[in-house]
């Protein structure tokens, strides 16, 4: 949004206040978490990093470990600024989950050799796998299908799942469903690779 006052142009960025607590800015990935669909935007940052990197796993593993190390402290420090224990604005869980999914797919696509589709020059086979992984990850994370939703809220899970899930840590719930979404989305892509190789 912008408006004129005299000869000056003022630009107002909605839903972004960079003067707030530093931990809050980290938790929301510098305001992305406050945008509509913040988790998707955060996941998209990881996807673009993977596509632009020469070796996607290296930067994702490095930043993944850094974020994983600091994320619990960031979560605890910023929690009083949120309205719930699983705030939608907190998007570091989506960053970690998407990074995990991409790393798994990257490793297995190297092992399997990737698809042999006739793709345009501007996109290689591995980039296609990453885009598919991104789409699947967001579907699982948004819909909370099956184990993803059970991890976030065990009360909605079958009895056998509830008996095996004994954690009561709020952060574990926040991060757990994204890790489950990562395993499911990357698992489907790996299954696609396996079927392709089997069909050769």
What are these regions (language model features)?
Residues 1-4:
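Methionine residue identity
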Residues 55-60, 118-125:
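Interfacial loop-to-helix junctions that mark the boundaries of transmembrane helices
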Residues 191-200:
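Juxtamembrane boundary at the C-terminal end of a transmembrane helix
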Residues 44-56, 102-105, 159-160, 189:
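Interfacial segments of multi-pass membrane proteins
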Residues 62-75:
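Small-polar-interrupted transmembrane alpha-helices in polytopic inner-membrane proteins
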Residues 10-44, 73-102, 120-125, 135-184:
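Interhelical loop and helix-boundary elements at the membrane-water interface
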């Amino acid at each position: 949004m912008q408006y004129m006052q005299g000869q000056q142009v003022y630009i107002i960025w909605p839903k972004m206040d960079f003067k707030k607590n530093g931990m809050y800015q980290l938790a929301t990935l510098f305001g992305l978490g406050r945008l509509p669909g913040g988790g998707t935007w955060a996941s998209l940052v990881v996807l673009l990093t993977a596509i632009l990197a020469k070796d996607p796993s290296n930067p994702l593993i490095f930043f993944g470990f850094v974020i994983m190390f600091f994320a619990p402290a960031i979560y605890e420090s910023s929690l009083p600024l949120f309205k719930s224990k699983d705030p939608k604005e907190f998007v570091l869980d989506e960053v970690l989950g998407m990074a995990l999914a991409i790393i798994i797919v990257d490793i297995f696509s190297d092992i399997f050799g990737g698809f042999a589709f006739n793709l345009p020059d501007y996109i290689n086979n591995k980039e296609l796998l990453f885009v598919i992984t991104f789409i699947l990850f967001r579907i699982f994370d948004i819909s909370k299908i099956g184990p993803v939703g059970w991890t976030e809220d065990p009360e909605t899970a079958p009895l056998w799942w509830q008996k095996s899930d004994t954690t009561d840590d709020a952060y574990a719930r926040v991060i757990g469903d994204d890790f489950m979404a990562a395993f499911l989305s990357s698992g489907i892509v790996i299954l696609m690779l396996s079927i392709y190789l089997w069909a050769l």
